[in-house]
């Protein structure tokens, strides 16, 4: 691994949530040159854990969250603060424009470049698809033509999610999160554009960039009630820190169809700024959406990360 510069202790952002110390004493021994993967639901303290590991043992914090890549979302995505990013090496945070598309394939290529730097990676985030692509490989699925994407957008809007699910092949429907409109639409587009189900394409996956056996993989499994309280408290802190202004800055080019528009809380606060709902209703809806997202994350991690070392919280 490459030699690292000395650095000062990392500061803490106004809305950063720490991880209780006791569960961390149960961590496995991690060699200083071994890659670390940290997955966990939103507001579970995974970013604080990643920063602590890099501060104590060296390396670079690498983002594995699909929304923290966008430059327009620092507060709503709970991206590390500018001071935190300056205090420790960070990669793949806030480097993608709001109107750009960004997929697991884009992320995987950029992670490959980070691994080539030679610093020990501590890869942290809540996007399960990124971790599975990294440790299991990612199928080379053809790009969706714009006309198929437009057809899918119209189909979802007119017929609804349930109808789109019914039109998927059985093998794919059994493997993806059918409650996630983005995942369902992507699978529908692949089938429509190629005539083959997403599951068939995934069966031809290339070897993984970082096999699970070559890393220390940690998954945070928090108590749901404890996590729900943290989610609500963190959103209040985000609002106090300027999240509404952050959303206001995106209004001129706001497009709900963009991947960046999936940031939890953004659609709700946009609705308020457009005079459609009062602020307290927008905040309540954003908190609910965040808790629902955390539940979907916990389900993914429980089903797909059974070989990962568990960190039970609190």
Swiss-Prot record:
The keyword Lipid metabolism appears for this protein: no
Keywords for the protein's UniProt record, in alphabetical order: ATP-binding, Magnesium, Nucleotide-binding, Transferase, tRNA processing
EC number: 2.5.1.75
Cofactor(s) it depends on: Mg(2+)
List of residues binding ATP: 40-47
Site (Interaction with substrate tRNA): 127, 149
GO molecular function, one term: tRNA dimethylallyltransferase activity
Keyword Phosphoprotein appears in the UniProt entry: no
Catalytic function, reaction form: adenosine(37) in tRNA + dimethylallyl diphosphate = N(6)-dimethylallyladenosine(37) in tRNA + diphosphate
Protein's job: Catalyzes the transfer of a dimethylallyl group onto the adenine at position 37 in tRNAs that read codons beginning with uridine, leading to the formation of N6-(dimethylallyl)adenosine (i(6)A).
Stored NCBIfam families: miaA
Protein name (Swiss-Prot/TrEMBL): tRNA dimethylallyltransferase
């Amino acid at each position: 691994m490459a030699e690292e510069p000395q650095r000062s202790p990392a500061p803490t952002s106004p809305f950063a949530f720490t991880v209780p110390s006791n569960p961390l004493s149960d961590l496995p021994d991690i060699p200083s040159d071994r890659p670390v993967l940290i997955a966990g639901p939103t507001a579970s303290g995974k970013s604080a854990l990643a920063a602590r590991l890099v501060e104590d043992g060296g390396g670079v914090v690498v983002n594995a969250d699909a929304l923290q890549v966008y430059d327009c979302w620092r507060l709503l995505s709970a991206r590390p603060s500018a001071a935190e990013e300056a205090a420790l090496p960070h990669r793949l945070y806030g480097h993608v424009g709001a109107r750009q598309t960004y997929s697991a394939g884009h992320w995987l290529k950029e992670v490959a470049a980070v691994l080539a730097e030679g610093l020990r990676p501590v890869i942290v985030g809540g996007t399960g698809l990124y971790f599975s692509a990294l440790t299991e490989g990612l199928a080379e699925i053809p790009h969706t033509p714009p006309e198929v994407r437009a057809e899918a957008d119209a189909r979802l809007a007119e017929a609804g999610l349930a109808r789109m699910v019914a039109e998927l092949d059985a093998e794919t429907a059994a493997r993806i999160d059918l409650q996630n409109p983005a995942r369902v639409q992507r699978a529908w587009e692949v089938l429509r554009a190629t005539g083959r189900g997403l599951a068939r394409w995934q069966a031809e996956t290339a070897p993984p960039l970082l096999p699970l056996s070559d890393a220390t993989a940690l998954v945070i499994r928090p108590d749901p009630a404890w996590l729900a309280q943290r989610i609500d408290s963190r959103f209040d802190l985000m609002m106090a820190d300027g999240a509404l202004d952050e959303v206001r800055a995106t209004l001129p080019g706001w497009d709900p169809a963009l991947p960046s528009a999936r940031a939890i809380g953004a659609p709700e606060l946009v609705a308020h700024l457009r005079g459609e709902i009062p602020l307290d209703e927008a905040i309540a809806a954003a908190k609910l959406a965040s808790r629902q997202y955390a539940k979907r994350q916990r389900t993914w991690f429980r089903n797909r990360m059974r070989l990962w070392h568990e960190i039970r919280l609190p």
